[in-house]
Amino acid sequence: MGRIIAGQPVLFRRSRGYVPRSIALSSPVVPLLACGAHLKNTFCLAQGRDAYLGPHMGDLENLETLAAYQRTVACLQRFVGIEPEIIAHDLHPAYQSTRYALARPETCKIAVQHHHAHVAAVMAEHGLAGPVVGVAYDGTGLGSDGTAWGGEILLADLAHFERLATLRPIPLAGGDLAIQQVWRLALALLDDAFDGAPPLPGLALFKEIPAREIALCRRMIAEKLNTPLAHGAGRYFDALGAIGLAATQSHFEGQVAMRWNFVADAGETGRYDFALDTTGRPWVMDLRPMVRQATMDVVDQRGPAVVSARFHNTLVAATAETLRLVRQQHGKHPVVLSGGCFQNARLTESLLGTLAPDFSVHLPAQVPPGDGGLALGQAVVADAVARLL
């Protein structure tokens, strides 16, 4: 399953005809198993110059799926004849794929940061040793500092990465509940952008939300009760989509973000303002000016098609400006785009158009940009790290 983006096919899910066809690696790797992500899981067995991505296993959220995952790993391992010496896994200790990895008998276990793996998957597909500048935009992934990342610009080779820039984080009031009840995301973003006094009465989104719920959500954020911070670009799609579409709930992963993408006016070229804070490390892409302007457009009853298009254009402009500053400080390196947000054709094609012809940009093609391609990145990172041990 996939679509055409920027004139080339991009796979979203590898299945019959692609699995278990090997992906050719530019450099040989030791025998290893990369266990993949928690959502949209695939795993990867690799040895020499061949990497074999397993089939789409789905979300490892119940015992039946986990049992199927374990059987499929064993089946493909027998089929390709690989006895892994290294087991690679995500940093997140609660992922079932991580727990499976840590329970295996092999002694060499290597944890790979989620967004480094996203970038490395595209590097592996295109034979890039690095350094590259990787743009990894998705919903969430555990960062090396213990917070939720997902709006990242990294300077990376296969063994190392440096976090150069990130999106300003959004508080998730209620944790994962905020990803389902997206009005919570919107409220947190609005309070941050408007210094606690957003124009809620002018937004249809909040007309059906009880005042008590709003007050409780604000108290959770103020007192930091079960309210982790999330840097994910996907959370901005959810929050702005909630505001612009008056969508209080997301009934499946990415629902509001996809609706927000689909309504965008293809002909709209305007954008909102943004700021880039370069005083610390990482730099922070601050979209609060955009949030304020987009919200007032919604209050003034400007249609969601225009607001969505301007949101997309602003995220593209902020990313491109950051990449230009990165190049000034770190030199000219290839740019890699990865993460689930780059399944969004408008975002991807617009960013490519903005960066051309000054940047060499690489997209995933035969490996999904989302978590379905993560295991390939885990595999090549783990091999590179193991060679330094």
Residue spans for each PLM region:
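A contiguous, well-structured pocket-lining segment that forms one wall/lid of small-molecule binding clefts
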Residues: 34-67, 71-75, 188-333, 345-353
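Glycine-rich phosphate-binding/hydrolytic loop that grips phosphoryl groups
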Residues: 116-137, 141-143, 182-191, 238, ...
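Internal gly/pro-rich beta-alpha loop/helix module
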Residues: 1-26
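Short beta-alpha connecting loops at secondary-structure transitions
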Residues: 163-176, 201, 220-225, 360-365
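Short glycine-aspartate micro-motif
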Residues: 32-34, 88, 132-136, 230, ...
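Short glycine-rich phosphate-binding loop at a beta-alpha junction
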Residues: 81-93, 330-341
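Short beta-strand scaffold segments in enzyme catalytic cores
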Residues: 1-3, 41-46, 135, 151-155, ...
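Conserved phosphate-binding/catalytic loops in two-lobed NTP-binding clefts
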Residues: 90, 107-118, 333-338, 345, ...
